[in-house]
Amino acid sequence: MKRLAFLVFFLVASLVLGAQGLELPKVGRGEIIVVHTGHTLSYNPKCLIPDWVAYELKASKLDGDAQRRKSFSPDPSPVLKGYAQAEHYDYTHSGWSRGHMLPAGDSKYSQTVMDESFYMTNVCPMEPSFNNGPWRRLEEKIRKWAVEYGTVYVIAGAIVGNNRHGKVGDSDVVIPDLYYKAVLVPYKGSYLTVAFVMPNEATDKRKLKEYAFPVDKLEKAIGKTLFYGLPKSAARRIKPYIPLKELGLY
């Protein structure tokens, strides 16, 4: 069974890395990788949330008439067979919202992609005013970058930290302390990168630039190489830098 599980992981990871999507991080041994039409994720069966969700966002795909689903459902991917998942009702009346990692607002171009964004593997417990405040403002800013630059590459992730918020629901879904998004933007023949690290707590009035973080420091904090498809020379040059002016983060 372990050999079969490793073979499945190897084949899926090879598929993911072979695609060379710039949004993808370096996949570690043992990660449970799920590839959907609109996003790729790494599932954490102990916490019942995704460790990260990566996706490409194109300006040409920001519009569409795909309909939001009325509820969330378990992810039917065969890769997840045998693993526990959270349920929609785990969040009901809990005081925590179902926070999208791949936003539904970025999924309107395809009903399939929209439906996938409502899998439980694409959501994490978020404090409601955070989900509807800084997290939403960041989603909107990233859409503006997609319009301006044509395509952006995004990875969203959860940082459990000290798990000071505990768990939610009968399934014991772990509530992360922090969330992050890292963004790769094509810029004048090269790229820019920026990360945002946000506490999972009641909203405050900080501007987005106050959450900005160099991607290389985020990588050290989470122990993962982001945007693994970038040439190393470009990564060394741009990851330590926060391009506040270039990206309009005033």
Predicted regions located by residue number:
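Positively charged n-region of N-terminal signal peptides that target proteins for export
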Residues: 1-4
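Domain-level detector for secreted/extracellular nuclease and nuclease-toxin modules, and
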Residues: 15-250
